[in-house]
């Protein structure tokens, strides 16, 4: 699973990097985190978390600094979080998380993306109850038992630790993600491939042929929207 999460980040960065969409999206996240607290990541855990994620996605330092500088200014631009749930072909389910300065625009864009690409937007809660919110931490290593013990000693609410192909994947309670990251740092982990809050499907579906092609186009349409921050789904191997 660790390889899966690392591959997701790599694919998204490669796909979005050409148009700098990933930079813009992280810029908004960094701005919001800095605006809501101190603009210093050493004094603002939420800001440090976003910056770490941005670095994992290869966001340049100047983009990060620009977003923080903007938050230090007198701008009063307000962003609102949103969630849109829906369905794709053949049992596929999707959760879209947004961060926007114009809710009406975003809602219309997401609904259009669903409708024009073989999907249907559902009501709030129609999909999310079939997903579990968890913290996901991925880093190089192979001793899952040792990592599990370290996290327990640090009183981290850890669900599971997996080792695969030289990669450790840790699943924590969402409230303990930051605590888990710090515990691992305290035990010598210096570099993380993934540190994310994820919505993980309780079961997955396999799509093939036209269904898979339709689903991929739907996901691309949703992720290409500037206001969409994260897209979660239950399709295996994607």
Swiss-Prot record:
GO terms, biological process: regulation of DNA-templated transcription
Q: Determine if Zinc-finger is one of this entry's keywords.
A: no
One Pfam family recorded for the sequence: TACO1_YebC_N
Give the subcellular location: Cytoplasm
Keywords on record: Cytoplasm, DNA-binding, Transcription, Transcription regulation
**Annotated HAMAP family:** Transcrip_reg_TACO1, Transcrip_reg_TACO1_YeeN
- Membership in a protein family: Belongs to the TACO1 family. YeeN subfamily.
Protein name per the record = Probable transcriptional regulatory protein M6_Spy0297
What's the source species for this entry?
Streptococcus pyogenes serotype M6 (strain ATCC BAA-946 / MGAS10394)
């Amino acid at each position: 699973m660790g390889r899966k999460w690392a591959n997701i980040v790599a694919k998204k960065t490669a796909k979005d990097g050409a148009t700098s969409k990933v930079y813009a999206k992280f810029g908004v996240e960094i701005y919001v985190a800095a605006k809501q607290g101190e603009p210093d990541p050493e004094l603002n855990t939420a800001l440090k978390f976003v910056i770490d994620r941005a670095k994992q996605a290869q966001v340049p330092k100047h983009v990060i600094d620009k977003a923080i500088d903007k938050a230090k200014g007198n701008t009063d631009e307000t962003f609102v979080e949103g969630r849109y749930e829906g369905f794709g072909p053949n049992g596929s389910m999707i959760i879209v998380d947004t961060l926007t300065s114009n809710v009406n625009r975003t809602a219309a864009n997401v609904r259009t993306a669903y409708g024009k690409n073989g999907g249907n937007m559902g009501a709030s809660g129609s999909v999310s109850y079939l997903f579990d919110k968890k913290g996901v931490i991925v880093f190089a290593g192979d001793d899952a038992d040792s990592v599990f013990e370290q996290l327990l000693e640090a009183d981290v609410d850890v669900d599971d630790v997996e080792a695969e192909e030289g990669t450790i994947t840790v699943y924590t309670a969402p409230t303990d993600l930051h605590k888990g990251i710090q515990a691992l740092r305290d035990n010598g982990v210096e570099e993380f491939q993934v540190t994310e809050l994820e919505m993980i499907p309780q079961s997955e579906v396999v799509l093939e042929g036209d269904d898979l092609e339709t689903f991929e186009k739907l996901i691309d349409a949703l992720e290409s929207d500037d206001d969409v921050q994260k897209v979660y789904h239950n399709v295996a191997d994607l």
